[in-house]
């Protein structure tokens, strides 16, 4: 990613980015995004070795970017600096793997039952904490042999076709969620094709491997551009994947004109599943054959969802379900930030950041928390013992299964 050298001159030194930073609020030693971003960037541009070990503690939540009144790309400056920062060997090796969840998924799903058993063992977690600096308190999500396929049914010319970008978690951990996305869109008149894409690249950026993120972006752009040329829009069910496709592809590919133009086209043609369905709701085309239910929900908006500037589509959709009461928690970052919360040296920071959210959930006493981000779900369940689910699952469960999909009537 290339940051405009003059962007630092737009910094007013107002410190509003520090006020918005979740880590700054819980760790008095953390210098904050203003210092790690534009202040040190002035020295970096002069060739001064000014990188700090604190760079690694940036969550990558982009709250600093949203807060900045002058649009300074603070998080991008930090991400670029993080990519140049040298780490101890053990952390570098761990972060190399964390930057490649697709590769990790392929290896663990060769024999998923054995992989899951090994990763769940306390002894294995102990050795991972000693050898790889992975927090022993964390439990890895179960891996499943990838079996998400484009359904043969309902691929008719009359339906609007969309290209589903599944992401690594759906592909290797929750393919059932991917099938539910397809079923939900099917019930609302869409034909869904599953994209043959890899990792979006967010974990690579988060772990300081911008070069790997660039390679991932190029591979994905080739596939997604073909879908757009075929007249499809792209839909995502993961807030981080959606952020990458809409916002960050252009940043990591801006030095390559051909790919940068394609990335811009992809950004303009990408929607979250919730955005797509809110559009149907506003047009009066949403399938509202919902059965009455008695469910008390709390909704948590992930940071990467907020960074897309699309409002809260899932909060509005879940409010349409009869018998459902839902509270928008608006309690800040959960602190997990993908692989961040798995790192031993960051576990306590991760939990401290999430404490405000945990307290709000415990006060609200919902039966369930709805949130689009898989690692937000993991953190919420880890910090509160309250079940967290993707809104797709909740909305799909609300349909009257006796009634057919919209365009089959």
Language-model-detected regions and their locations in the chain:
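A ubiquitous short alpha-helical element
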Residues: 46-49, 63, 96-100
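Short, intrinsically disordered, charge-biased short linear motifs at domain edges
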Residues: 1-8, 45-55, 185-188, 319-323
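Cysteine-centered iron-sulfur cluster-binding motifs in ferredoxin-type domains/subunits
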Residues: 5-24, 50-72, 172, 304, ...
């Amino acid at each position: 990613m290339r940051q405009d050298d003059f962007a630092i001159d737009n910094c007013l030194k107002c410190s509003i980015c520090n006020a918005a930073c979740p880590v700054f609020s819980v760790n008095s030693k953390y210098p904050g995004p203003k210092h790690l971003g534009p202040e040190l960037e002035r020295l970096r541009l002069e060739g001064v070795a000014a990188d700090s070990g604190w760079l690694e503690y940036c969550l990558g939540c982009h709250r600093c970017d949203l807060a900045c009144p002058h649009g300074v790309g603070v998080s991008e400056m930090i991400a670029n600096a993080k990519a140049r920062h040298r780490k101890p060997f053990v952390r570098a090796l761990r972060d190399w793997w964390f930057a490649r969840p697709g590769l990790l998924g392929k290896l663990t799903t060769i024999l998923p039952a054995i992989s899951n058993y090994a990763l769940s063992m306390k002894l294995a977690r102990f050795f991972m904490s000693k050898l790889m600096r992975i927090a022993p308190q964390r439990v890895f999500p179960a891996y499943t042999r990838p079996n998400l396929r484009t359904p043969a049914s309902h691929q008719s010319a009359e339906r609007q076709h969309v290209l589903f970008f599944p992401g690594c978690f759906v592909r290797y951990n929750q393919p059932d969620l991917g099938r539910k996305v397809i079923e939900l869109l099917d019930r609302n008149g869409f034909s869904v094709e599953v994209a043959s894409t890899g990792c979006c690249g967010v974990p690579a950026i988060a772990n300081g491997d911008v070069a790997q993120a660039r390679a991932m972006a190029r591979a994905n752009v080739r596939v997604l551009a073909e879908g757009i040329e075929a007249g499809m829009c792209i839909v995502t069910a993961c807030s981080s994947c959606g952020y990458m496709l809409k916002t960050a592809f252009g940043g990591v590919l801006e030095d390559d004109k051909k790919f940068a133009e394609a990335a811009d086209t992809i950004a303009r043609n990408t929607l979250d599943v919730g955005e797509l369905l809110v559009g149907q709701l506003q047009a009066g085309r949403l399938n509202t054959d919902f059965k009455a239910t008695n469910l008390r929900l709390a909704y948590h908006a992930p940071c990467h969802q907020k960074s897309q500037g699309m409002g809260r589509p899932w909060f509005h959709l879940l409010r349409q379900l009869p018998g459902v009461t839902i509270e928008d928690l608006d309690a800040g970052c959960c602190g997990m930030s993908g692989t961040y919360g798995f790192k031993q040296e960051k576990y306590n920071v991760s939990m401290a950041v999430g404490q405000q959210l945990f307290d709000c959930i415990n006060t609200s006493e919902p039966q369930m928390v709805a949130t689009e981000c898989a690692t937000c779900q993991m953190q919420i369940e880890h910090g509160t013992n309250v079940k967290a689910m993707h809104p797709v699952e909740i909305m799909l469960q609300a349909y009257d299964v006796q009634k057919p999909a919209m365009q089959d009537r």
